[in-house]
Amino acid sequence: LNFGTLSSLYSNVDVASTAGAGSIIVTCTPGTAISIALDYGVNGGSATQRYMSNGNSSTLAYQLYQDANRANVWGSSTLALSVASFPSTTQTYTVYGRLFATNGFPAVGSYTDTVTVTLTY
């Protein structure tokens, strides 16, 4: 998921994954119950917010969601996406991201995080 190049961050930045760029593609037997969990990243995130780091001491807060309205956080355990009966052999799941606004200017740099996807069936 790429939030792009930003010169300021005075308002939230919303993005959505695409096939080959952040979407989760699952191939499974139809009718199987599955759960797709996302961990909170390597920079000390939580169900409230995740963090991207520039490799130094600067971080930017963001979150990942299951829906375009950004109402349902996509996380682990009870915040995982549950599918009671997998509908077809292959499904693509979009990940919706929000980079939260900051007061002032964040430190210059490339900010990254690594989020692990766990599929349980």
Which residues does each predicted region cover?
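Short beta-strand and strand-turn-strand segments in soluble, beta-rich domains
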Residues: 69-78
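Predominantly extracellular/luminal cell-surface or secreted proteins
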Residues: 39-41, 63-67
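Residue-level signal for functionally critical sites in structured catalytic/ligand-binding pockets
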Residues: 61-63, 112-113
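Amphipathic alpha-helical hairpins/coiled-coils and adjacent low-complexity
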Residues: 57-59
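N-terminal small/polar-rich segments of proteins
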Residues: 1-54, 80-121
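Glycine-rich, pocket-lining loop/helix-strand segments that form or immediately flank
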Residues: 53, 62-64, 74
